[in-house]
From Swiss-Prot:
This is Bifunctional protein FolD. Belongs to the tetrahydrofolate dehydrogenase/cyclohydrolase family. Keywords: Amino-acid biosynthesis, Histidine biosynthesis, Hydrolase, Methionine biosynthesis, Multifunctional enzyme, NADP, One-carbon metabolism, Oxidoreductase, Purine biosynthesis. It comes from Actinobacillus pleuropneumoniae serotype 5b (strain L20). GO terms for cellular component: cytosol. Pathway: One-carbon metabolism; tetrahydrofolate interconversion. NADP(+) binds at residues 166-168, 191, 232. The gene is folD.
Length: 285
C-alpha cells in the first residue's frame, strides 16, 4: 500500500479562494474590507517567515493587514497598550501576536489581553473553553486546519480511534478536542507516556505534533491509518516532519507531506477566522 498524499497546499488554495469570493461580495456592497493586525516582536527568522506568509495571504484574498513590527527589547506594558488600542479599533477584526515572544513578555498575559472576538489565533481561554464545551467559535488554527484536511479525505471519522502525539496548548490539547467533537475516540500521548509505539499502533488516525524530527516511526503505523504530520523541523537545510515519512507512507492510507501539508492550512484557517470575526463584527454594527 502507498498512501494517498493529502495536499495542504491544494486544500488551502480552495479555502482561500472561497474566502476571497465572500470578501468580494461584501466589498461590492460598499462594506469595508476585513482587518487583521499582525504584531511581531523581535527579528526571529522563523517568526518573520510565518508573519510574511500571513501578510501575503491577506493581500491575496482582500484582507487589510496592519503591521506592527516591534524591536526585541519591547516591554510587556508597551505591547499590552498596543493590544488594548487594537481591541477598540473598529477597523480591526482580528489581532495576531506572533509567538514565541521575548523572555521579558508573558505570553499568557498577552494572549488573554486580546478580546475573545478578535482572537483569530484561537488561543484565548474563552475560545478554547467553548471548543471544550462543544460550542466552538474562533478555533485554534492548526487543529482547525487538520480537521479540514481530514474532511478532504472523505473518510467518516465517527468512531475512529485517534492518537494525538504531543500535548501542547497550541496543537495537542485543542487537537484532541476537535477530534472528540468529530466523534473520534481520542488518546493523547506526551513526554511521560509509556509504550508510545503501542498507542500509535492502535490508531486509525495519528496526529503528530512534538517538534522532533522523525520521532514517530513508520513501523509503528497501523496499516491503513491516516497520518497527519504537524511537525516542521529543519535538518541539514531540509524541512522534515515529526513522522518518518517514507516508512509511514508505505503503510498509511492517507498522509500529509512536510512541507506542503499542515503548514498552508494553518494560515488558511487564520484567514477563515478573520473572515468569521469580520462577519460577527458587521452584524453587531
Amino acid at each position: 500500500m502507498t498512501a494517498h498524499i493529502i495536499s495542504g497546499t491544494a486544500v488551502a488554495k480552495q479555502v482561500k479562494a472561497n474566502i476571497a469570493e465572500q470578501i468580494q461580495a461584501y466589498t461590492a456592497q460598499d462594506k469595508r474590507k476585513p482587518g487583521l493586525a499582525v504584531i511581531l516582536v523581535g527579528m526571529d527568522p522563523a517568526s518573520q517567515v510565518y508573519v510574511n506568509s500571513k501578510r501575503k495571504s491577506c493581500a491575496e484574498i482582500g484582507i487589510e493587514s496592519k503591521s506592527y513590527d516591534l524591536p526585541a527589547e519591547t516591554g510587556e506594558a508597551e505591547l499590552l497598550a498596543i493590544i488594548e488600542q487594537l481591541n477598540h479599533d473598529d477597523s480591526v477584526d482580528g489581532i495576531l501576536v506572533q509567538l514565541p515572544l521575548p523572555k521579558q513578555i508573558d505570553a499568557t498575559k498577552v494572549t488573554e489581553a486580546i478580546v475573545p472576538h478578535k482572537d483569530v489565533d484561537g488561543f484565548h481561554p474563552y475560545n478554547v473553553g467553548r471548543l471544550c464545551q462543544k460550542i466552538p467559535t474562533l478555533r485554534s488554527c492548526t487543529p482547525y486546519g487538520v480537521m479540514k484536511l481530514l474532511e478532504s479525505t472523505g473518510v467518516n471519522l465517527a468512531g475512529l480511534h485517534a492518537v494525538v502525539v504531543g500535548a501542547s496548548n497550541i496543537v495537542g490539547r485543542p487537537m484532541a478536542m476537535e477530534l472528540l467533537l468529530a466523534g473520534c475516540t481520542v488518546t493523547i500521548t506526551h513526554s511521560r507516556t509509556k509504550d508510545l509505539a503501542y498507542h500509535v499502533s492502535q490508531a486509525d488516525i495519528v496526529v503528530a505534533g512534538v517538534g522532533k524530527p522523525n520521532f514517530v516511526k513508520g513501523e509503528w503505523i497501523k496499516p491503513g491509518a491516516i497520518v497527519i504530520d504537524v511537525g516542521i523541523n529543519r535538518v541539514e537545510g531540509k524541512l522534515i516532519g515529526d513522522v518518518e515519512y517514507s516508512a509511514a507512507e508505505a503503510k498509511a492510507s492517507f498522509i500529509t507531506p512536510v512541507p506542503g501539508g499542515v503548514g498552508p492550512m494553518t494560515v488558511a484557517m487564520l484567514m477563515q477566522n478573520t473572515l468569521q470575526a469580520y462577519q460577527v463584527h458587521l452584524q453587531a454594527v
